[in-house]
Amino acid sequence: MPLSTQPPASGERYVLTACLDNARNLSSLLRAVHFQDHATCFATANGLKVTVEDAKCLQANAFIQAEIFQEFAIQEESVMFRINLAVLLDCLTIFGASSLPGTSTALRMCYRGYGYPLILFLEEGGVVTVCKINTQEPEELLDFDFCSTNVVNKIILQSEGLREAFAELDMTSEVLQITMSPDKPYFRLSTFGNAGSAHLDYPKDSDLMEAFHCNQTQTNRYKISLLKPSTKALALSCKVSIRTDTRGFLSLQYMIRNEDGQICFVEYYCCPDEDVTEADL
């Protein structure tokens, strides 16, 4: 019997039940935000959001819409818990390299509520494994207050363009400087490493540029150590939306197509490292 059609054991009431025919559609997105051991899971009728934070300066969110799941049932307005992300990923890939080509691991994920473990039923080739992962009290998450009304500049790039940039830029630099402007250089990435300064420019009519909406010239610096985790999402994505707001906060939203061709999103928020004056440029 497929996991998605198995009824819960008698007397068990889950506040959250989610089923996937292919667990990789979840694990690949979770890897894209796995730069700390713990994550906060937040579920509503719209789907599941998994949030990871670092040093109160960086926040990553993986969004898995309810439509991605073969079954997604929630009995409360919202469900929230903290979990060890490394353990969750280990469980989701428990069949690992033993998987035969063309096969996938089916997943049924159940949660009874506060204080209870997250239960994973994983099935592949007729073999079912059950994992129970302890959940924790969720911590208060950062509110980056990044709203669209305060966005000053926004561009959408094909991800290959940004992947090439990260491969070419000098990662010995402590910061990545991002310039966005309605005039030249339009979109510029700069580093200041051991070999000196390096700049990479993207004209607004570049084949890689899908959208260009810049209202004013803005130059901000961001710690490369904070941006490096986002390259995990970049590697999986087909497009990336880059936005800055009036405070210089950065939003990187990656559009990721899963193995079934469905679109999911991973978003990174990063605060600027320092203000850059005209004298610095």
Question: How would you label these PLM feature ranges?
Answer:
Residues M1-T172, T179-L281:
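DNA polymerase sliding clamps and clamp-related checkpoint/processivity subunits
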